[in-house]
């Protein structure tokens, strides 16, 4: 599934709401999600191939921190935190694994008591906490998941949206509402 913006080709298609020439006074909060034609964003319904991982690694390299809710943090930690058993994933997954492992992570959760894996809990008023993260110096924040992005969209805090549309129907799972 290669997202291609230059010619619209490939099996997946990237739709972004912000032109690359836009400059922000604060570091931008970017939201990127894979979604099927029926709006499903369940990672199990979307095959993760080499091109898709390469695209998401490029997105990760445009940010200096990741912002997750509890569910997304736990899912990403289970998938990417080292050590991965030998032979458990193809070599082409290593760049994204290394990038995610090295990234600073912020986790919005009232349920978790502590986090590690280069992560910090975000508590208190969501609007103020995220605005504070955006005011910090850096390249940007990359947001993933479903529930937290919905809350942040309602607060008007997301600066860029990217939907990587997968040409399939899932028929089940969470939807990007």
What are the residue ranges of the model-derived segments?
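Serine/proline-rich low-complexity intrinsically disordered segments, especially terminal tails, linkers
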Residues: 7, 18-19
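Extreme N-terminal basic, low-complexity initiation segments
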Residues: 1-12
């Amino acid at each position: 599934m290669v997202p291609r913006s230059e010619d619209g080709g490939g099996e997946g298609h990237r739709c972004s709401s912000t032109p690359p020439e836009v400059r922000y006074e604060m570091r931008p909060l970017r939201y990127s999600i894979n979604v099927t034609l029926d709006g499903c964003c369940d990672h199990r319904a979307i095959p993760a191939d080499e091109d898709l991982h390469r695209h998401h690694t490029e997105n990760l390299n445009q940010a200096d921190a990741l912002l997750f809710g509890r569910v997304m943090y736990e899912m990403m930690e289970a998938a990417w935190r080292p050590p991965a058993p030998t032979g458990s994933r193809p070599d082409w997954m290593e760049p994204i694994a290394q990038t995610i492992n090295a990234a600073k992570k912020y986790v919005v959760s009232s349920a978790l008591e502590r986090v590690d894996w280069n992560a910090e809990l975000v508590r208190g008023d969501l609007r103020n906490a995220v605005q504070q993260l955006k005011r910090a110096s850096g390249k940007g924040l990359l947001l993933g998941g479903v529930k937290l992005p919905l809350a942040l969209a309602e607060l008007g805090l997301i600066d860029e949206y990217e939907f990587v549309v997968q040409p399939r129907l899932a028929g089940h799972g969470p939807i990007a509402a």
